[in-house]
Amino acid sequence: MAKFQPKVQDEGRDDGLREKMIAVNRVTKVVKGGRILGFAALTVVGDGDGRVGMGKGKSKEVPAAVQKAMEEARRNMVKVSLKNGTIHHNVTGHHGAAVVMMAPAPKGAGIIAGGPMRAVFEVLGVTDIVAKSHGSSNPYNMVRATFDALVHSTTASQVAAKRGKTVEDIFA
């Protein structure tokens, strides 16, 4: 079973990125001679200003698995547009059986989200958001569904550009 451990990892890197470990699982591979034990880690990395990435790593030791996951998260970063510490509009993300619904929140509301979603929002730089998950509570699926929702959120200027209109026409 996954252990939720959203704690900040500090390995002395000075790249200005926030790192959080979401889950560490003990995994086994059954071979002719018995079982081979190992660990799988799930982590997220963000700059606190709209860039976030997730990674997973496996190794026979926990620190090595976490390190691999952090490196993969750094390689897989995506840019998300934020507005005053929240998202622009309601958005839904899916991955497997996990469904994540997010809504912008007023200033001072804080991060109203549970489990792995909270860790993603903290490293992303979101300060006010309301999020709810349905279906699967698997941390990996929840993080992927959160990323799906964040990547599919758009700004008013992006919508206006797609429609060939001005931003004022969109809000009229």
UniProtKB/Swiss-Prot annotation:
InterPro entries: Ribosomal_Su5_D2-typ_SF, Ribosomal_uS5, Ribosomal_uS5_bac-type, Ribosomal_uS5_C, Ribosomal_uS5_N, Ribosomal_uS5_N_CS, Ribsml_uS5_D2-typ_fold_subgr
Presence of the UniProt keyword Iron-sulfur in the record: no
GO cellular component: small ribosomal subunit
The entry's keywords: Ribonucleoprotein, Ribosomal protein, RNA-binding, rRNA-binding
SUPFAM superfamilies: dsRNA-binding domain-like, Ribosomal protein S5 domain 2-like
BP GO annotations: translation
GO molecular function, one term: structural constituent of ribosome
S5 DRBM domain residues: 17-80
Notes concerning its domains: The N-terminal domain interacts with the head of the 30S subunit; the C-terminal domain interacts with the body and contacts protein S4. The interaction surface between S4 and S5 is involved in control of translational fidelity.
Complexes and interactors: Part of the 30S ribosomal subunit. Contacts proteins S4 and S8.
Matching PANTHER family: MITOCHONDRIAL RIBOSOMAL PROTEIN S5
Function: With S4 and S12 plays an important role in translational accuracy.
UniProt family annotation: Belongs to the universal ribosomal protein uS5 family.
Name of the protein described by the UniProt record: Small ribosomal subunit protein uS5
